Curated annotation (Swiss-Prot):
Protein name: Large ribosomal subunit protein uL14
Organism: Agrobacterium fabrum (strain C58 / ATCC 33970) (Agrobacterium tumefaciens (strain C58))
Keyword RNA-binding among record annotations: yes
Keywords: Ribonucleoprotein, Ribosomal protein, RNA-binding, rRNA-binding
Subunit field text: Part of the 50S ribosomal subunit. Forms a cluster with proteins L3 and L19. In the 70S ribosome, L14 and L19 interact and together make contacts with the 16S rRNA in bridges B5 and B8.
NADP found in the keyword field: no
PROSITE patterns reported in the protein's UniProt record: RIBOSOMAL_L14
UniProt gene name: rplN
Record-level GO BP terms: translation
SMART domains xrefs: Ribosomal_L14
MF terms in GO: large ribosomal subunit rRNA binding; structural constituent of ribosome
Amino acid sequence: MIQMQTNLDVADNSGARRVMCIKVLGGSKRKYASVGDIIVVSIKEAIPRGRVKKGDVMKAVVVRTAKDIRRADGSVIRFDNNAAVLIDNKKEPIGTRIFGPVPRELRAKNHMKIISLAPEVL
């Protein structure tokens, strides 16, 4: 459950380390984003010589949330941190690698490139 001002880790090698959500996309006055949703983020911490720099405003896909994700079979999945993957305007990831597990709910939201780059799909 990601809202405005939420800090997230970046789960790719785009050069960003931490980002802050500044807008949840999809509908007017939408307050919360969950796994697979697209948000607008500001880069708060980045490494030198990365593809992005501090202060950049980008779009990102939420890939992990500390809030439970309920599945149709009744099971629940949750992660230790909130994490996102930076994307471009064509919804393709900026980085070439994804770090950490991602849930299979991303498949239903058509983020197949992120699924294919991820080391583990839960």
